[in-house]
Curated annotation (Swiss-Prot):
UniProt KW Endoplasmic reticulum keyword: no
Subcellular location: Cytoplasm
Protein name: Co-chaperonin GroES
Record note on quaternary structure: Heptamer of 7 subunits arranged in a ring. Interacts with the chaperonin GroEL.
Lineage, opening ranks: Bacteria, Pseudomonadati, Pseudomonadota, Betaproteobacteria, Burkholderiales
Role, per record: Together with the chaperonin GroEL, plays an essential role in assisting protein folding. The GroEL-GroES system forms a nano-cage that allows encapsulation of the non-native substrate proteins and provides a physical environment optimized to promote and accelerate protein folding. GroES binds to the apical surface of the GroEL ring, thereby capping the opening of the GroEL channel.
GO CC, alphabetical: cytoplasm
GO-annotated biological processes: chaperone cofactor-dependent protein refolding
HAMAP family per record: CH10
Family: Belongs to the GroES chaperonin family.
Amino acid sequence: MNLRPLHDRVIVKRLDQETKTASGIVIPDAAAEKPDQGEVLAIGPGKRDDKGALIALDVKVGDRVLFGKYAGQTVKVDGQELLVMREEDIMAVVNAK
């Protein structure tokens, strides 16, 4: 991937959501109101505070994150659709069990 985010921006690959329930009922995309999930592919160096000190990001490459339906900007890189968003658009990091 030849995309390097700047400042507090994060590159996220959207993960497919479950479209079927455990009982086999198919859920249409319009009815699924869950936040989207994705994997962090790259992060910027962070943003600067008022004194110019760099504040590192809380997310790391490889983290699985939750974000809102309209978060970020979609870009196409090497035939793959990715999202570029600010770290503040990320709602949570999903911890593996």
